[in-house]
Amino acid sequence: MFFVLSPAKNLNEKDPCPVSEFTQPDLLAESEILMRQLRELAPQQIAELMHVSDKIALLNAERNAAWHTPFTPENAKQAVFMFNGDVYEGMDANTLNTNQIQYLQNHVRLLSGLYGLMRPLDLMQPYRLEMGTAFANLRGKNLYEFWGDIITNLLNDTLAQAGSNTLVNLASQEYFKSVNTKKLRARLITPIFKDEKNGKYKIISFYAKRARGLMVRYAAEHNITDPEMLKNFNYEGYAFNDAASNESEWVFMRSEQIK
């Protein structure tokens, strides 16, 4: 069983990584192709392409200029400790033990606009390139056309090498669109997290993102290899709802918190 997650825009570049183990991204040669094109963009072009402020555009122009291989622990950081958004706050990898971190490495993959597909302990240098960005490139008009079936093929190889036949999709729609589900050789399960608000259950983005990270943490802390055991996920008040679920979409609900 493998999980796939989206990356995060917010990055933690400063805090030291709590583990020394690292791996290299499998698709770094593809990343270098993209980065060569990204480096050609002036800050103003980055601002327009990515719909960001001038300050963020300048930061990322500087990141692009500084980006270089080979990656080492001195100039890069393990991805699961670099990403710093809601999903990763829910996972809170910094407080997992060595065996649990190894579980992440063995069972979790991170989608990325620049790096394609990463292991949690793959080294990465800071960047900003969301998968949905309309970044025209040598292979097409956007990143979905750039990556084509490359990410799907690597996922299939990863699943086959591990003898696994289940992929748990905890990524956003924007990122999971980079996976060709018609060619994916695995059973696909998509957990959906709903919170009660004013008597109705709905997906609330912030809570849903955090819950995705919490589910990965739950799996790591319980060393889960059987997908059915994920139905016992109960962190922060969530519970599996069988009636609202089907074979491929598993719904977890949480009652409104009384403050």
UniProtKB/Swiss-Prot annotation:
Pfam families reported for this sequence: H2O2_YaaD
GO biological process: response to hydroperoxide
GO CC terms, sorted: cytosol
Record-linked InterPro entries: YaaA (IPR005583)
HAMAP family given in the database record: UPF0246
Family named by the database record: Belongs to the UPF0246 family.
NCBIfam families membership: PRK02101.1-1 (NF002541), PRK02101.1-3 (NF002542)
Identification of the protein by name: UPF0246 protein NGK_0633
Source species: Neisseria gonorrhoeae (strain NCCP11945)
Organism taxonomic ancestry: Bacteria, Pseudomonadati, Pseudomonadota, Betaproteobacteria, Neisseriales
